[in-house]
């Protein structure tokens, strides 16, 4: 039950793959959801108001 250097060597599997909708390497292999565009979770593209720079 260690959480140090010895357990870090066991991390070998890929968590994220390339998304086929947005192309970024953000598609979670286990949940099959893209954290960048929302593919697999919603049919619309994932966007938020806080992503854009403020005009003033």
Curated annotation (Swiss-Prot):
Asked if the Swiss-Prot or TrEMBL record annotates the protein with the keyword Zinc-finger, the reply is yes
Q: Which SUPFAM superfamilies match?
A: Zn-binding ribosomal proteins
Q: What is this protein called?
A: Large ribosomal subunit protein eL37
Say which domain of life the source belongs to: Archaea
What keywords sit in the KW lines? Metal-binding, Ribonucleoprotein, Ribosomal protein, RNA-binding, rRNA-binding, Zinc, Zinc-finger
Gene3D superfamilies, per database record = 2.20.25.30
Q: Which organism is it from?
A: Methanosarcina mazei (strain ATCC BAA-159 / DSM 3647 / Goe1 / Go1 / JCM 11833 / OCM 88) (Methanosarcina frisia)
Set out the biological process GO terms recorded for this chain's protein.
translation
**Positions annotated to bind Zn(2+):** 19, 22, 34, 37
**Can you quote the record's cofactor note?**
Binds 1 zinc ion per subunit.
Q: Spell out the GO cellular component terms annotated for this protein, sorted alphabetically and separated by semicolons.
A: ribonucleoprotein complex; ribosome
């Amino acid at each position: 039950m260690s959480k140090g250097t010895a357990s870090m060597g066991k991390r070998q599997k890929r968590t994220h793959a390339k998304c086929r909708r947005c192309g970024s390497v953000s598609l979670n292999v286990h949940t099959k959801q893209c954290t960048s565009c929302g593919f697999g979770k919603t049919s619309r593209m994932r966007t938020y108001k806080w992503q854009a720079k403020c005009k003033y």
